[in-house]
Every structure is written in structure tokens, then in C-alpha cells.
């Protein structure tokens, strides 16, 4: 592939917005401590830029940025801001502790947005871009400007907006496909023409931020690279507003597997992709579909007899990449009652969990208790421990009893509250799960409205467990929860408690939190 700008770096910058745009996916809200856990994993993955949130819209995002900035030194840390002086100043304060700060400002540019959202003329948009990018540069040296809804903006006006932003000091220009409307050819042509017609284009990095409303986010991001983009904005598992964003794992593996065609690299340590994906699934309670490219459970599964025969002869017949390249590896280390803390920590790191000393101590105590109940501890068991400890500080399930009462079910649950006190409640329902959720609601005081509920098996043979996935609503906001146990009713209780604890840990979630969407 011939790139449009030979002077640009041969390595694509990966801008991960899982903690900002990804979190805007319904049910994927994360409190500050969970964002820190995820940011550590993104750092270990090799992400170049981590967008941590929108500090002006949320105190939790402000706190998350502060926590992350104190710890992470390698990646650039970005925060989003509207073109408003107060937003920009708040964002700059949130970035004060960052070693490599970036201020990311955006403004809509399309005629539809100008007329109905901004109620601004072209001249007013240009004036605002110049004013607020200039202000941002007085506070932070690294400034990214995003022309929201760029792909539906008149080409001549988009060129003018880009010129003004560069003249005002922007170091990165992002041209988003905000509603996932464009096709690869249109995206490629847009980048090619804007770069060719804007003075100073060779002095900045052009970025693409593509949404997946028509399933083209990854294809459009690749087309943007062909048109000259040298930064791609993406998320783990493709989570994000509406249908999501460009999936980091898919984009990076395309560039790796088809490197002879694209001749462009990334800084991503691909062997950490699966563990990072699984960590996110646990944190937000949103599993990926089994046939999801790269990270789905079936991504390297072969059932057809013809395919299996070919694989036995040569793996290359039906596999274009090795499972180990993205982190699909089996542990050869057996964990049990004689395993030490170092062995447990090493396995947790391989699974994508980077723990503070206090959290590791808590997990190891739970590990030793589990070893009293079963001879061996699997990766699935460790992930359940993580869900029960570092993720679920709050109410813990102590015991439960389900019984039939005529045509109804009765549930008795006993919980340990955040202070360690025991709380017991009972409830009746139309079935065991309905009764269980009623008892949990009575015990915690959290009311959740169930939208969907699924149970499936994870693991193989004697190690198999039931995983419960539920989607619930609280104050008209959707949340996802996941629980895993050898008992599916217990797994359901853990999934329910995961959501309840998340709500109780973050008071903002107990209200209607407004997310401001970009691009």
C-alpha cells in the first residue's frame, strides 16, 4: 500500500477511548478505581494514547484522570472537552499530574449539527474553533481537535475548519465518522483531499474515529490509514456509543496479519489482547459474542470435519494467525493448595489483572479458601475471585436457599454488607430467579428492573461453570452484570450483586448521569 504522506511515522498511533467513548455504551459505566484497573491493562497492552474521560461532565471522570495520571508515565493521557472555556480549564486542571497530557477539544461542523444542535453559522464555528484551540494551546502543548460529524460536513468547509485548527495550534486533527454513515471509499477520499489541500497538514497527525452503525468501523479506519491518517481511535471489544467503535483488537490484527499489504506497524503487544478483552468484559459485565473476531470463544474453534482434517495436516490451511499471538494460551502452571502468592500473582498478570499489594493480599486469602474446597484452581476460578473481591467491594453473598411454596418460589439470602455485618431477607417470586432478585433487592435496598437474562456454560468438563449475564435498568439507565459459579442460581445472584455494588460504589450512577457524546 502506498501511503499519502511519506514523511509521516510508519507506526500507527493507537488512541484508546474505552474509558471515555466506550464507557458511554449502555451499562458500561465504570467508577474511578475500575478505570484505573483498566488503564493499567491498556498501558501494558502498549496503547499510545489513553482517553480517560470527560472531566467537565463528571466528577468521577475528573477523579479517574487524577488517579491514572499519578501512576501511568509512558502513555499520553487525554481528556475530552467541548469548545467552552470552562470545560477546557477544568480539563487542563485534571491533566496537571499527567507526564504526557493531551487536551482533546471538539465542535460539530456538519450542516445538520450547525443548524439543529449548535445553531451557529459557518463563521461562528470557525471563530469558536480558533478561540478554543488557541486557549487550549496556552494550557497544554498537545492539543487534538475533532470536527464532529466530519464525514457529513461540506468538503470545502471541512478543509477550512482544519486549516483554522492547525493555525490555532492543534497538533492532531481528528475527522470522525460520528454516526457510522460513510463507506471506506468515501473515508479514504476525505482524508486524501483534506490532507492535500490544507496548509500545514504535514506538521500534524491526522486521526480517524469511526463508529460501527453500519458495521464498517474497522474497514473505514483502515481506509483512513490508506488516505493518510496516522492515528486511529478505537476501543477494546469495539464498545461505545450505539453500535460501538472501531475494535482495537481487530484493527491491530489486520495490520499485523496483512503487514505485507499495509506496511504499517502498531505499538500493541498483541499477546495481551485476549486478557485485556476479558478484563473489560468482567469490569463492565458485557461479554462478547462467541463468534467475535479475534477475542470470541469461537475465533479459533474448528468443528467441520474437513476443516479439522486440514488443521491436522497444517494449521495454515484454516488459520491465518496463531491463537498465541493474541493471547489465547493455556496455562501449564497448576494452581492448588501448595501454590504461593507469587504463582497466583503471575497467573493473574497473564490474565490481565495488575493488582496493588492490598488487593493481591485479599485475592490470595480468597484463593486459599477456595483451595480448601477443590483440588485445583483454574483460570475461570481466578476470574471469579477477581469479580468477588477487587471488583465487588460491597455486598457479598454468604448463603442462599431456594424452595417451592405451592406455585411460587421462596428465596432466603444472607449477605455480608460493606461493614461486614450480616443481612438476611426473604422474598417470593414466580420462579427461583425472580424470588432471588426480590430478596437481594430487599437486602441491599437497590431496585433493579430486569430487561434480559441469559445463562451459559464456560470451561470444559469438570471445570465447567455456569455464567449468568443480565441486563437491568435503574433510574432509566441500563447496566450489565456477569456472575460465574458452578451453581447457576448462585451465578445469577453474583451477577445481580455486581450491578448493585457498582451502583452503590458510585453515587453518580444512582442518579441519571448524562454522558456527552463525541464523534
UniProtKB/Swiss-Prot annotation:
It holds the Pfam family HCS_D2. One of its GO terms (biological process) is L-leucine biosynthetic process. It is found in: Cytoplasm. One of its GO terms (cellular component) is cytosol. Keywords: Amino-acid biosynthesis, Branched-chain amino acid biosynthesis, Cytoplasm, Leucine biosynthesis, Manganese, Metal-binding, Transferase. GO terms for molecular function: 2-isopropylmalate synthase activity; acetyl-CoA C-acetyltransferase activity; manganese ion binding. Pathway: Amino-acid biosynthesis; L-leucine biosynthesis; L-leucine from 3-methyl-2-oxobutanoate: step 1/4. Its main location: cytoplasm. Its EC number is 2.3.3.13. Residues 396-519 are annotated as: Regulatory domain. Disulfide bonds: none annotated. Its cofactor is Mn(2+). It catalyses: 3-methyl-2-oxobutanoate + acetyl-CoA + H2O = (2S)-2-isopropylmalate + CoA + H(+). It is an enzyme of class 2 (transferase). It comes from the Bacteria. Residues 12-274 form the Pyruvate carboxyltransferase domain. InterPro entries: 2-IPM_HCS-like, 2-isopropylmalate_synth_dimer, AIPM/Hcit_synth_CS, Aldolase_TIM, LeuA/HCS_post-cat, LeuA_allosteric_dom_sf, LeuA_bact_synth, PYR_CT. Mn(2+) binds at residues 21, 209, 211, 245. HAMAP family: LeuA_type1. Catalyzes the condensation of the acetyl group of acetyl-CoA with 3-methyl-2-oxobutanoate (2-ketoisovalerate) to form 3-carboxy-3-hydroxy-4-methylpentanoate (2-isopropylmalate). Homodimer. Belongs to the alpha-IPM synthase/homocitrate synthase family. LeuA type 1 subfamily. This is 2-isopropylmalate synthase. It comes from Xylella fastidiosa (strain Temecula1 / ATCC 700964).
Amino acid at each position: 500500500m502506498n501511503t499519502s504522506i511519506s514523511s509521516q511515522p510508519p507506526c500507527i498511533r493507537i488512541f484508546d477511548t474505552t474509558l471515555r467513548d466506550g464507557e458511554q455504551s449502555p451499562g458500561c459505566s465504570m467508577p474511578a478505581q475500575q478505570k484505573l484497573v483498566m488503564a493499567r491493562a491498556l498501558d501494558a497492552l502498549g496503547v499510545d494514547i489513553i482517553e480517560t474521560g470527560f472531566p467537565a461532565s463528571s466528577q468521577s471522570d475528573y477523579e479517574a484522570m487524577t488517579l491514572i495520571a499519578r501512576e501511568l508515565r509512558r502513555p499520553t493521557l487525554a481528556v475530552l472537552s467541548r469548545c467552552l472555556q470552562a470545560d477546557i480549564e477544568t480539563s487542563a486542571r485534571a491533566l496537571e499530574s499527567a507526564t504526557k497530557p493531551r487536551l482533546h477539544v471538539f465542535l460539530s461542523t456538519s450542516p445538520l449539527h450547525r443548524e439543529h444542535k449548535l445553531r451557529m453559522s459557518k463563521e461562528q464555528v470557525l471563530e469558536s474553533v480558533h478561540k478554543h484551540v488557541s486557549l487550549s494551546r496556552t494550557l497544554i502543548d498537545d492539543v487534538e481537535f475533532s470536527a464532529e460529524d466530519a464525514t457529513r460536513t461540506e468538503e470545502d468547509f471541512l478543509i477550512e475548519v482544519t486549516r483554522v485548527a492547525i493555525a490555532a495550534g492543534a497538533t492532531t486533527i481528528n475527522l470522525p465518522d460520528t454516526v457510522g454513515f460513510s463507506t471506506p471509499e468515501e473515508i479514504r477520499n476525505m482524508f486524501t483531499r483534506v490532507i492535500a489541500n490544507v496548509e500545514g497538514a504535514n506538521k500534524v497527525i491526522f486521526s480517524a474515529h469511526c463508529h460501527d452503525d453500519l458495521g464498517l468501523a474497522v474497514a473505514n479506519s483502515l481506509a483512513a490509514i490508506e488516505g493518510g491518517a496516522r492515528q486511529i481511535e478505537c476501543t477494546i471489544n469495539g464498545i461505545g456509543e450505539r453500535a460501538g467503535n472501531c475494535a482495537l483488537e481487530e484493527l491491530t490484527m489486520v495490520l499485523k496479519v496483512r503487514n505485507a499489504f499495509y506496511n504499517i506497524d502498531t505499538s500493541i503487544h498483541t499477546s495481551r489482547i485476549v486478557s485485556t478483552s476479558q478484563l473489560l468484559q468482567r469490569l463492565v459485565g458485557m461479554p462478547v459474542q462467541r463468534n467475535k473476531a479475534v477475542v470470541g470463544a469461537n475465533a479459533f474453534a474448528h468443528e467441520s470435519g474437513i476443516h479439522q482434517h486440514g488443521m491436522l495436516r497444517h494449521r495454515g490451511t484454516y488459520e491465518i494467525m496463531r491463537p498465541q499471538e493474541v493471547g489465547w494460551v493455556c496455562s501449564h502452571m497448576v494452581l492448588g493448595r501448595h501454590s504461593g502468592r507469587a504463582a497466583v500473582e503471575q497467573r493473574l498478570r497473564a490474565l490481565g489483572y495488575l493488582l496493588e499489594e492490598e488487593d493481591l493480599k485479599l485475592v490470595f486469602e480468597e484463593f486459599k479458601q477456595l483451595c480448601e474446597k477443590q483440588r485445583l484452581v483454574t483460570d475461570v476460578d481466578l476470574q471469579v475471585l477477581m469479580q468477588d473481591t477487587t471488583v465487588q467491594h460491597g455486598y457479598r453473598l454468604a448463603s442462599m436457599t431456594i424452595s417451592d411454596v405451592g406455585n411460587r418460589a421462596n428465596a432466603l439470602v444472607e449477605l455480608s454488607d460493606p461493614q461486614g455485618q450480616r443481612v438476611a431477607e426473604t422474598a417470593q417470586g414466580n420462579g427461583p430467579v425472580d424470588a432471588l432478585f426480590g430478596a437481594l433487592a430487599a437486602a441491599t435496598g437497590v431496585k433493579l428492573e430486569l430487561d434480559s437474562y441469559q445463562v451459559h456454560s464456560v470451561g470444559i468438563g469438570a471445570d465447567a461453570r455456569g455464567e449468568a449475564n443480565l441486563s437491568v435498568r435503574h433510574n432509566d439507565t441500563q447496566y450489565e452484570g456477569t456472575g460465574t459459579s458452578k451453581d447457576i442460581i448462585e451465578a445469577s445472584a453474583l451477577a445481580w450483586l455486581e450491578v448493585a455494588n457498582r451502583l452503590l460504589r458510585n453515587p453518580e450512577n444512582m442518579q441519571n448521569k448524562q454522558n456527552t457524546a463525541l464523534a
